[in-house]
């Protein structure tokens, strides 16, 4: 197989794989890969219904008394995209060509094209962070100035809201599957307080971004946490919005499956250039499944 063809094939195969463990905020996403998607399309995505709890007052239960559970269809607008460009110089191409085994060639291709895929992953993470506008806001949308004395209260309030759910018997909480997505600054507060409990099991499960457990949440750090800037008393103040929800059960997503790379060399050039584009869309279909808070986080030495 020609090296250019090998690069395109391996990259496309990697792109189609679900990279859930390599996402940060995207761990809240249930991504479904779709073929033949275009920017601006609206696609049907199957989304898992929430858990249901009802009062039990005695007697037998049968199918007529059980509320339907399973999946529901969510309309997701494909309104996000990322163009991808990378190049391989002759030295890298020769290294791939001269690899002793096919597995070594594949490993090198993955290594040299990894940054392009990571850029797409970051775009998905950012889109998930932006879904905080659908979240149930804590403290009536008033800003909470994070300190070492109240950071635990944000988690407690988020947990309470998720357990309560919609107040009609649907809860958004399930032990062992809850995620908190926070900024590096908020993690700094929690780390200095030594309240994060590390878990080898959870670290292997969640992988990228995982920093520990707290109050039933697997805490994941994301640099792209959503932020807004407001003028307060004549000064610009930046607020950030941590997210709290259930892994793979909070945000619905449609992601392009049939990603195709093009390749070519510039006139007179030696490097092989690769380019392509991928589209996707995300949506938090039920606001009570996602909780956020408007936080002012300023970590300094001595905080």
Spell out what each predicted region is.
Residues 2-29, 36-39, 44-53, 77-79, ...:
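Sequence/fold signature of self-assembling virion shell proteins
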Residues 40, 55, 69-71, 81, ...:
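Generic alpha-helix structural propensity
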Residues 50, 58-72:
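Active-site-surrounding "flap" and adjacent substrate/cofactor-binding loops of secreted or lumenal enzymes
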Residues 72-102:
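Short acidic, glycine/tyrosine-flanked loop/strand segments centered on an H-E-D-like triad
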Residues 91-97, 160-165, 222-230:
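Short regulatory "switch" loops immediately downstream of catalytic or recognition motifs
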Residues 97-168, 297-303:
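Alpha-helical scaffold segments that mediate packing/assembly in large oligomeric complexes
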Residues 101-111, 170-178, 210, 236-243:
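Glycine-rich, flexible loop segments associated with nucleotide phosphate handling
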Residues 136-210:
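Extended, solvent-exposed, turn-rich assembly/linker loops in the middle of proteins
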